[in-house]
């Protein structure tokens, strides 16, 4: 996709979140809290939990300027379903590494360093949002991308294992269209990290610092995963013509 886009807009994942940050800045708010329209608050103390720990320091003297909660599904589980992936999804599944990371985060202290962001359960202080914006050109995963943006400028995201919402995602009209967005997303992220890591003054973000999840998605291995998944879905899945077009791009 082209790399143009309005930084603040009502279209595009990153631009919409920047709209929220801009509104908070104009109104002089110290904290911005994000809740998506497909998520449900389960606790009347949601906003109290959102601000828990913000502005404080860890025992190592690291400031907590941004933190993420997590979501549970309809069955009250925070983990990805562990049913064996279909053959056509073998190279695109990320359940095991995500669940490994989630197990660690949930069994740690309440506030721990995060490898991920749940954009619909996310809080950030003015100290961070006044310096770091969401990337308006990202096609999907603007929340995880924001973690990279923060790390590039020397800021961390923290995980609060006592703060969560329920995620009720809508039906997906086309898996192929979503896959194409992910293809653009991961290819863009690789190029972005390469450029940032070679830029003087930027903090380097290495895939190994994101183990067990989402490390492999920020490594060159993702190129093969894209090609193999598209090929498998051309052979075995629905929307074969759409996947063939993606494979041939």
What is each of the regions a protein language model found here?
Residues 139-146:
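Acidic donor-binding loop at a coil-to-helix junction in glycosyltransferase catalytic cores
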């Amino acid at each position: 996709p082209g790399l143009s886009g309005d930084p603040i807009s009502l279209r595009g994942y990153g631009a919409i979140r920047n709209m929220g940050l801009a509104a908070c800045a104009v109104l002089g708010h110290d904290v911005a809290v994000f809740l998506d329209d497909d998520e449900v608050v389960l606790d009347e103390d949601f906003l109290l939990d959102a601000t828990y720990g913000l502005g404080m320091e860890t025992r190592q003297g690291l400031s907590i300027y941004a933190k993420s909660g997590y979501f549970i599904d309809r069955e009250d589980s925070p983990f990805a379903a562990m049913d064996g992936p279909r053959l056509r999804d073998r190279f695109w599944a990320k359940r095991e590494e995500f669940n490994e990371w989630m197990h660690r985060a949930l069994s740690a202290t309440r506030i721990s360093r995060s490898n991920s962001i749940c954009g619909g359960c996310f809080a950030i202080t003015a100290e961070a949002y006044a310096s770091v914006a969401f990337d308006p050109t990202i096609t999907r995963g603007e929340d995880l991308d924001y973690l990279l943006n923060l790390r590039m400028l020397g800021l961390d995201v923290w995980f609060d294992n006592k703060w969560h919402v329920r995620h009720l995602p809508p039906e997906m009209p086309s898996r192929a269209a979503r896959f194409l967005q992910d293809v653009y997303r991961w290819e863009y992220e690789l190029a972005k990290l390469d450029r940032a890591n070679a830029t003087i003054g930027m903090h380097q973000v290495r895939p190994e610092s994101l183990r067990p999840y989402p490390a492999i998605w920020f490594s060159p291995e993702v190129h093969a995963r894209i090609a193999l998944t598209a090929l498998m879905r051309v052979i075995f899945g629905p929307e074969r013509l759409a996947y063939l077009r993606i494979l041939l791009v």
